[in-house]
Amino acid sequence: MKRVLSTLIFVTLLLITWPACQSNQEVRIDDDDLGGVVTSSQGAEAGVWVIAETRDLPTRHIKIVVTDDQGRYLVPDLPQAIYDVWVRGYGLVDSEKVQTEPGKALNLTAVVAPDARVAADYYPA
């Protein structure tokens, strides 16, 4: 009986804690959003800017969001257009611009700056 009870307790604890152990980095987006995960050679990039810019509209349109602690981002409610999207942040150099449109998931790769001087050229303190 003790063994059954201890097994039952173990399984219950496992089921309770399992979702917290999962690295669920998927970002849900709809037809007018951009979203994804930003990573670098050092893993998920928390607190960096994701910039989406277009000149396909009557005026230039830019939205900037910040990644969460798992590197996830969501740029919501964008007008339909082709956007240049890139990453900027402390200790990074600007990533290459990627063209995309709303409604698509886009994972981005941040580029770690080789030294503090180069990083300051992109993101001064």
Label each PLM-derived region with a short phrase:
Residues 17-33, 37-43:
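Beta-strand-rich domain onsets/edges
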Residues 22-27, 100-123:
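Extracellular beta-sheet/turn segments enriched in Thr/Pro/Gly and aliphatic residues
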Residues 45, 74-82, 90:
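Short Pro-Gly-centered beta-turn/loop motif in secreted/extracellular proteins
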Residues 32, 40-56, 80:
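Short, ordered, surface-exposed loop/turn motifs in non-cytosolic proteins
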Residues 55-60, 82, 86-99:
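A short, solvent-exposed loop/turn motif at the edges and junctions
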Residues 8-18:
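Bacterial N-terminal signal peptides
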Residues 28, 55-72:
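Short, acidic Ser/Thr/Gly-rich low-complexity loop/linker segments typical of extracellular
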Residues 36, 50, 67-75, 108-110:
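Glycine-centered loop-to-beta-strand initiation motif
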